[in-house]
Amino acid sequence: MIIFKNLILKISSLKFAITLIIFIAITSGVGTFIPQGNDPQEYIDFYNETPIFGLINGYQVIKLQLNHVYTSNWFLFSLILLCISLAACSFRRQIPSLKAALKWTDYKNEKRFYKLQLTTNYKVSQDVNHILKADSLLRKKGWSISKFENRLSARKGLVGKLGPIIVHIGLIILLIGSAYGNFSSQSKEQYLRLGESLDLINENKNSKFTIKLNNFLIERESDGKPKQFISYLNFFSEEQHLNEIKTTQVNHPIRFRGLTIYQADWSVSNIVLEIDSVLYQLKLKPIPEIGDQIWGLLIELGRENKKNYLLTIDNENGPLKVSNIKDFSEMFIYLNDDPIEINSSKLSLKKIIPSSGLIIKNDPSIPFIYLAFTLIILGTIFSLIPTNQIWILFNENSNKLFVGGLSNRNLLGFKKEFQKLSDEIKNN
């Protein structure tokens, strides 16, 4: 029993909770530094050649579960331990403190007043019921009163005692919600061409609604570098009588019916090329060997003596570069320009079709996260509210009225209020 009590004392201590929070913060940073959820062989290949800090190789990364930090056993255990620490702190300190604050403290002897933070006394007339008048004055100013024949107790701001408990509840919900989200959230990266649609399916394999890319714009800096990507998405469903247009751009996701859609990337997915009076829609692929934002494909051109040419493009406006892979000669085809002849074939570029790169995320823990942060903010605000207490005692023998006050925070502000109330009670 003694061991259990000592364990609870240690777990509920502020030092233990802060240590856990620092540990969780550091390991969360590790989770952002090391890519998460990839194939185990990728970690082995990469970190065996370049170990972390020269010590941790690929096999150790997997053994320590650093390839999935947020769902690892030790990370979840630390979250559970922090929840227990916060709950133990609430039951051991905050709730008893609230219960104590709810009980009225009755000061029957003027000697107790001299031990308070603020105290004053003055001679009064016996003909006036000063306790009754003080009671009326304080009630008008929003104080709660417990009154006796020759004394009263008053308090205000008791909600401040609830603040730490609400913050702890919010933190516990946040930790539970985060852990739940790590296991239940789903994320998918999808590239949509202009006019292309995507059906979103729920767990029962029934179509919830469809999204369609109506328009996609790229804003560029004066030097041509991409500044912003903007997608105009149509959400529609005949069954649900749904038809809405929403816009997403980088750092401004769409939140719709439990889904969050982020603007993540873009690409040139297709081109429409006219070759010898025949239209072809050609699908392009990224070519990272040439550059970061370059797409292209290999094509044969020529009516009799066919040759291989590499078609590449690096933006949504063109031009299309045509490279002979043997002699490295280059030609450029501009959008809607006159046809050019390459190896007896006539080519013209009719259309460039960009794609919007979207990340579609379903995270059922989002309501828990919002609730948690709401509680944390409210609890923090409540915690800033001072709990003030005033006691008034009338001594019939000395004809003196004793007034004393106590505050758990902002003593300077309470001192001004106390002096003002004392003067009003004296002159009332």
Swiss-Prot record:
The chain crosses the membrane at residues 14-34, 72-92, 162-182. Pfam families: ResB. GO terms for biological process: cytochrome complex assembly. It is a multi-pass membrane protein. InterPro entries: Cyt_c_bgen_Ccs1/CcsB/ResB (IPR023494), ResB-like_domain (IPR007816). GO terms for cellular component: plasma membrane-derived thylakoid membrane. It is found in: Cellular thylakoid membrane. Keywords: Cytochrome c-type biogenesis, Membrane, Thylakoid, Transmembrane, Transmembrane helix. May interact with CcsA. Belongs to the Ccs1/CcsB family. Required during biogenesis of c-type cytochromes (cytochrome c6 and cytochrome f) at the step of heme attachment. This is Cytochrome c biogenesis protein CcsB. It comes from Prochlorococcus marinus (strain MIT 9515).
